[in-house]
Amino acid sequence: MIKAFADSMIKVFMPLIIYKASNNMLFAIIYLCAFEPLCALLNLVLKKVLQKYGVITIIIHFIPLIVVQFLLNLKITWWLCLIFALLMSLAEVLYYVPLNLLFSFTDRKVNVAKFQIATNVGKLVFIVLTGFILGSNFTNSLLIVTVTCSVLYLLSSIPILFGYGVLKKSYNKAVKHSRVVNTKSYKLFNLYHIEFGIFQVILEVILPLYLYINNLTFQSVAIIMALIEVCKIGANILAKFLVNKKLSFLSVIISISAMTISFAGMLISTNPLLLYIFSCCLGISFPLLFVPMFSSFIKKIVKDHNHFDGMTYREAYIFSCRGFLYVPYFVVPSFTAQFILGFVCAGCIGFTSYKILNDKKNKKQTIEVIPQRINE
C-alpha cells in the first residue's frame, strides 16, 4: 500500500508531468514509445538476474525511480525522455516479475483480489493529493512531490526487509520448481496478454492524457483517476466473489460489456460529465477481467511447473505491442485511433478469454514438461 502511495504520485502522472514541464506532447509520446518496448526487452535481458536475485530486486527497484524524480526538475529534452523511459522500465521489471512469481507460488485467486484492493486504496488519496499539488505552482510542487515520493519508496521497502527470509525461501522454491514447458496451449495466453496490455495502457496512460487535452485541469484528471480507483475497489470485491463461485466467465462478460460501452462513449462524446462516467465504467472493467484471467494463468503455470518462464514471458508479451499504440499520434495529434483500437480490442479479449476459460481439450491433455537446469 505504501508503494502504491508513491506510484500514484509519479507513475500515474509521469506522461502528464513531462507534457506540462515541456509544454510539448511529443516529448510525452517519445517517453511512452521508448518505455513500453524497453519493458519487454529488459524482461528477457534480465531474466537470469531476476531468477537468482528476485527478492533483492524487489527491494532495490525504487532506486531508478528516485533518480527519475530528481531528473524531472531539469529542463525536459527528448534525450532526457529516453533516460526516463530506461529508468522507469528498469524499475518496472525489477519489481513486477519477481512479485508475480511469488504470487504464482504462494497465493491463490482470493489473494489476487486482496492485493489489488490494497493497491487501489493506496492510490486513491494520493492521486487526488498529487493532482492538486501539481495543479498549483508547478516548479515548486514538483519538487515537493519528488521528495515525498522518494521517502515513501524508502519506507515501502521496510516491510520487505523484515520479511526477507520468508520471501526469499518462497521465491527460491518457486524458481527451483520452474520448468520449461513445451506446449501450444500458451499461445492463447500469449495472445490474451498482448490484448490485455493494449487495454491496460489505454486505461492507465492514454486516458489521463486524453482527459487533460480535452480541457480538463490536473485537479479534474486527478479526481477522475481517484474515482476510477474507487470503482476498481468495488469491482475487485465483485470479481473475487464471482471467481470464488466459479463464475469467472461471467466476470469477463461484465468486463467486456463495460469496456465496449466506455470506448464507444468516449469516441462519441467529449462532454466532461460523460467522460467521468465512461472513465469509471472503464475502471470497473479492469478488475473484472484481470482477477479471473490472472487466477486462471496462475493455475495453468502452477500445474505445468512453469512459474518463472511463465511470468517472465507474460510481462514481455504485455508490453510487446504497446509502443505501436503511440505511432498514430505522430501522424494525427489525437487519441481517437487508440480508442478505436481499444473498442476493437475489447471484442478480441472477450473471444480469447472465452477460448481460454472453456478450453476442455487443454484441461484434459497431458503436458510435456522439459526440466530446466537452474543456475545456482
Language-model segments: what does each one mean?
Residues I56-L71, L250-G265:
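Structural signature of the two symmetry-related core transmembrane helices
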Residues L41-G54, L134, A235-S248:
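Helix-to-loop junctions at the C-terminal end of transmembrane segments
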Residues W78-Y95, I194, L273-F290:
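Hydrophobic core of transmembrane alpha-helices in multi-pass small-molecule transporters
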Residues L143-F162, Q338-K355:
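Symmetry-related core transmembrane helices of the 12-TM Major Facilitator Superfamily/SLC fold
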Residues G163-E195:
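Juxtamembrane intracellular "pre-TM" segments in multi-pass secondary transporters
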Residues P15-A21, V125-T146, L209-I213, G323-G342:
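Transmembrane alpha-helix termini and helix-breaking/packing motifs in multi-pass membrane transporters
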Residues M1-A40, T183-A226:
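Helix-loop boundary and gating motifs at the non-cytosolic
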Residues M88-T119:
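Cytoplasmic helix-loop-helix junction between adjacent transmembrane helices
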